[in-house]
Amino acid sequence: MIERWTTAVLDTDLPGGWAVARGPDGFLYDDNGALFPRHWLKGQDLPLLAEHGIGHLDGEPVYLLELSARAEVPGCGWKGLRAFMLEGDHTLYKVLGYAAQIGTWAREHRYCGSCGRPMAQVPGERAMYCQPCDLRSYPRISPSMIVLITRGDEILLARSPRFVTGVYSTLAGFAEPGESAEDCLIREVREEVSIEVRNIQYVGSQCWPFPHSMMLGFHAEYAGGEIIPQEDEIEDAQWFSVHALPPLPASRSIARYLIDLYVARRLGHAEPVLPG
């Protein structure tokens, strides 16, 4: 199968192509979506911070215009990345997710973290460079584990105070230096709900551009202990029957995939497809 979207480092001095614009309120869009003819978009009165060539969509080059402030464009509005995730065009979401990660990284690395001098984009490479320090900075990716813990026909789900009201999800957490993904899983489960797990199985991964996580999905079986929610992190955690689940995360998330996959296998239903 031919991929419609492929990432690439493109020369911003070349003409043509499509462009997306990102500002403090998300991405610019109109009735046709978030992709605009690049020459038209660059002709608007936009507070341009930087431009990045990010890849090809259906063979056409795509660029990101990173803005320093909100701008008003006739016939257009602004929409956050999560809203695009929930809509039907998954390819567009992948384009915008990558654009958001590159834009955030470049914005946060305009100055050298060692000497404080301005950094420059490296031609032909996705890197920012400080010549006095001979320091290259590459896009940040933060490895995180996410795990569905099961006990027969029951699954353990939890609520963070930051979740939408009523929604429960799987446990997750960032890996620390020196940890494997499995080490991270065991530690996070102990910290968040005070139980032990066994038979840890890797399921799949998902890029999660909020802002730069790589979610490593696992399934694990309950091994022992009583649920004690971590103060300030877990509002509630409990076992739910696969026949009576609470409101769940968005269908595009790997958290939802882990849940749906286990439920499908327990009930003999068709297995879902892992979101890209």
UniProtKB/Swiss-Prot annotation:
MF annotations from Gene Ontology: magnesium ion binding; manganese ion binding; NAD+ diphosphatase activity; NADH pyrophosphatase activity; RNA NAD-cap (NMN-forming) hydrolase activity; zinc ion binding
Motif Nudix box: where in chain: 173-194
Keywords of this entry: Hydrolase, Magnesium, Manganese, Metal-binding, NAD, Zinc
EC number: 3.6.1.-, 3.6.1.22
Catalytic activity: a 5'-end NAD(+)-phospho-ribonucleoside in mRNA + H2O = a 5'-end phospho-adenosine-phospho-ribonucleoside in mRNA + beta-nicotinamide D-ribonucleotide + 2 H(+); NAD(+) + H2O = beta-nicotinamide D-ribonucleotide + AMP + 2 H(+); NADH + H2O = reduced beta-nicotinamide D-ribonucleotide + AMP + 2 H(+)
Residues involved in substrate binding: 82, 125, 138, 206-213, 255
Binding positions for a divalent metal cation 3 per the UniProt entry: 188, 192, 233
Record note on cofactor: Divalent metal cations. Mg(2+) or Mn(2+). Binds 1 zinc ion per subunit.
Gene Ontology CC annotations of this record: cytosol
GO terms classed as biological process: NAD catabolic process; NADH metabolic process; NADP catabolic process
Broad class of enzyme this protein falls into: hydrolase
Complexes and interactors: Homodimer.
Similarity remark: Belongs to the Nudix hydrolase family. NudC subfamily.
Function, as annotated: mRNA decapping enzyme that specifically removes the nicotinamide adenine dinucleotide (NAD) cap from a subset of mRNAs by hydrolyzing the diphosphate linkage to produce nicotinamide mononucleotide (NMN) and 5' monophosphate mRNA. The NAD-cap is present at the 5'-end of some mRNAs and stabilizes RNA against 5'-processing. Has preference for mRNAs with a 5'-end purine. Catalyzes the hydrolysis of a broad range of dinucleotide pyrophosphates.
Protein name: NAD-capped RNA hydrolase NudC
Source organism (scientific name): Pseudomonas fluorescens (strain ATCC BAA-477 / NRRL B-23932 / Pf-5)
The encoding gene: nudC
